[in-house]
Amino acid sequence: MNNRIQDKTDELLIITAEEAGELTQACTKILRHGVDEQKIKALIEEVGDMQCMIELLIAHNMMTQEDIEKRTKVKLEKLKKYS
Protein backbone atom coordinates (compact mmCIF):
# COMPACT_ATOMS: atom_id res chain seq x y z
CA MET A 1 0.00 0.00 0.00
CA ASN A 2 1.47 3.35 -0.93
CA ASN A 3 1.83 6.21 1.56
CA ARG A 4 -0.96 8.33 0.10
CA ILE A 5 -3.49 5.50 0.41
CA GLN A 6 -2.23 4.63 3.87
CA ASP A 7 -2.47 8.27 4.93
CA LYS A 8 -6.12 8.38 3.81
CA THR A 9 -6.82 5.15 5.66
CA ASP A 10 -5.11 6.44 8.77
CA GLU A 11 -7.09 9.67 8.62
CA LEU A 12 -10.36 7.80 8.18
CA LEU A 13 -9.61 5.57 11.16
CA ILE A 14 -8.52 8.49 13.33
CA ILE A 15 -11.70 10.43 12.59
CA THR A 16 -13.80 7.31 13.19
CA ALA A 17 -12.15 6.81 16.57
CA GLU A 18 -12.69 10.47 17.45
CA GLU A 19 -16.37 10.22 16.53
CA ALA A 20 -16.72 7.06 18.61
CA GLY A 21 -15.29 8.99 21.56
CA GLU A 22 -17.76 11.82 21.02
CA LEU A 23 -20.63 9.31 20.96
CA THR A 24 -19.34 7.86 24.23
CA GLN A 25 -19.31 11.34 25.77
CA ALA A 26 -22.89 12.04 24.67
CA CYS A 27 -24.03 8.77 26.26
CA THR A 28 -22.20 9.34 29.52
CA LYS A 29 -23.52 12.91 29.84
CA ILE A 30 -27.06 11.52 29.74
CA LEU A 31 -26.17 8.90 32.33
CA ARG A 32 -24.51 11.44 34.62
CA HIS A 33 -26.88 14.37 34.25
CA GLY A 34 -30.17 12.90 33.04
CA VAL A 35 -32.14 13.13 29.84
CA ASP A 36 -33.19 16.44 28.39
CA GLU A 37 -33.88 17.77 24.91
CA GLN A 38 -30.40 19.24 24.45
CA LYS A 39 -28.65 16.00 25.44
CA ILE A 40 -30.87 13.93 23.14
CA LYS A 41 -30.10 16.36 20.31
CA ALA A 42 -26.37 15.90 21.01
CA LEU A 43 -26.81 12.12 21.07
CA ILE A 44 -28.61 12.16 17.72
CA GLU A 45 -25.84 14.33 16.26
CA GLU A 46 -23.13 11.93 17.42
CA VAL A 47 -25.02 8.84 16.22
CA GLY A 48 -25.40 10.53 12.83
CA ASP A 49 -21.70 11.38 12.73
CA MET A 50 -20.83 7.78 13.60
CA GLN A 51 -23.18 6.48 10.90
CA CYS A 52 -21.44 8.77 8.42
CA MET A 53 -18.07 7.32 9.37
CA ILE A 54 -19.39 3.77 9.00
CA GLU A 55 -20.61 4.65 5.52
CA LEU A 56 -17.18 6.06 4.69
CA LEU A 57 -15.47 2.88 5.95
CA ILE A 58 -17.71 0.93 3.58
CA ALA A 59 -17.04 3.35 0.70
CA HIS A 60 -13.29 2.90 1.23
CA ASN A 61 -13.65 -0.89 1.08
CA MET A 62 -12.60 -1.47 4.66
CA MET A 63 -15.75 -3.55 5.18
CA THR A 64 -19.07 -4.27 3.52
CA GLN A 65 -22.62 -3.62 4.59
CA GLU A 66 -23.02 -7.40 4.70
CA ASP A 67 -20.11 -7.68 7.15
CA ILE A 68 -21.82 -5.18 9.42
CA GLU A 69 -25.20 -6.88 9.14
CA LYS A 70 -23.68 -10.25 10.07
CA ARG A 71 -21.99 -8.75 13.11
CA THR A 72 -25.18 -6.92 14.08
CA LYS A 73 -27.06 -10.23 14.18
CA VAL A 74 -24.36 -11.77 16.38
CA LYS A 75 -24.50 -8.82 18.79
CA LEU A 76 -28.29 -8.86 18.95
CA GLU A 77 -28.23 -12.55 19.86
CA LYS A 78 -25.66 -11.90 22.60
CA LEU A 79 -27.78 -9.08 24.00
CA LYS A 80 -30.86 -11.31 24.03
CA LYS A 81 -28.91 -13.99 25.87
CA TYR A 82 -27.43 -11.72 28.54
CA SER A 83 -30.19 -9.12 28.93
Can you name each region flagged by the protein language model?
Residues 1-47, 51-83:
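Flexible "arm" and connector segments at domain edges
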